[in-house]
């Protein structure tokens, strides 16, 4: 049973990582909008690695009488996957900072478009079950920094940005498995002229489990952005979520 619990915790370990994407979900742009970012990761004693992340918005559907859109970040790993793929969250486009900070619980549906195992979707009930089992709790703050304004280079030009402090903490404390605390602490440079509002973000990501402490430094910098006509085809929702398939068939 302890081994099974450890496997499930591995699967849910990606859920707290949504904390780093919530700063992009505030007041989403119109469907068809996209932006790409360079993501650099630095680990102690290792060379810095670089990858490109893409954020986009596609038409969604009404949920409880409210319009929703698909907010997608790609490519990322999700729920213990070995593969990186688009992760799409069905959310309201008009979320303010408070609602965006609760990105997980404010998602009406989540689709992970695994290119090897196939797509699957999670309902609100699925997410609630996972987070309840893991005893997931989190806090999130985005507050004015000093200096309050700063000009930086991003997206090929100088940008006058609002500078904010980011502090987010997520805790998982499931039965039979060691408690894990993940802390994001850093700076976000916001520019209202950028589609997702973020020109750059730099943060330290610290994971504490038992006596083990891991620290990474991550930097996201805007590369490009634009708009293209949204696809008329709906997102492939794939299979329904299954925790057993997740654990034994990742």
Regions found by a protein language model. Name each.
Residues 3-14:
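Sec-dependent N-terminal signal peptides
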Residues 15-19:
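Sec/Tat signal peptide C-region and signal peptidase I cleavage site
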Residues 20-106, 111-250:
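Acidic, serine/threonine-rich low-complexity disordered tracts
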């Amino acid at each position: 049973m302890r081994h099974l619990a450890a496997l499930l915790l591995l699967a849910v370990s990606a859920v707290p990582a949504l904390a780093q994407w919530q700063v992009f979900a505030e007041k989403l742009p119109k469907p068809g909008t996209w932006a790409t970012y360079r993501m650099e990761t630095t680990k102690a004693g290792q060379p810095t690695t670089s990858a490109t992340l893409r954020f986009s918005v596609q038409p969604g559907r009404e949920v409880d009488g409210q319009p929703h859109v698909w907010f997608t970040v790609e490519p990322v790993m999700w729920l213990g996957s070995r593969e990186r793929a688009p992760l799409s969250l069905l959310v309201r486009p008009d979320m303010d900072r408070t609602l965006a900070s609760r990105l997980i619980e404010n998602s009406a549906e989540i689709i992970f478009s695994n290119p090897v195992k196939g797509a699957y979707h999670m309902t609100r009930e699925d997410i609630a079950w996972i987070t309840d089992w893991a005893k997931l709790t989190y806090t999130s703050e985005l507050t004015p920094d000093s200096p309050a304004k700063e000009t930086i280079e991003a997206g090929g030009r100088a940008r006058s940005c609002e500078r904010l402090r980011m502090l987010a903490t997520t805790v998982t404390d499931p039965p039979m498995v060691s408690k894990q605390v993940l802390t994001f602490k850093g700076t976000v440079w916001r520019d209202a002229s950028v589609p997702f509002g973020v020109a750059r973000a730099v943060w330290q990501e610290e994971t504490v489990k038992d006596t083990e402490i891991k620290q990474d430094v991550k930097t996201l910098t805007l590369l490009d952005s634009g708009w293209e006509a949204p696809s008329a085809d709906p997102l492939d929702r794939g299979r329904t979520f299954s925790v057993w398939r997740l654990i034994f068939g990742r």
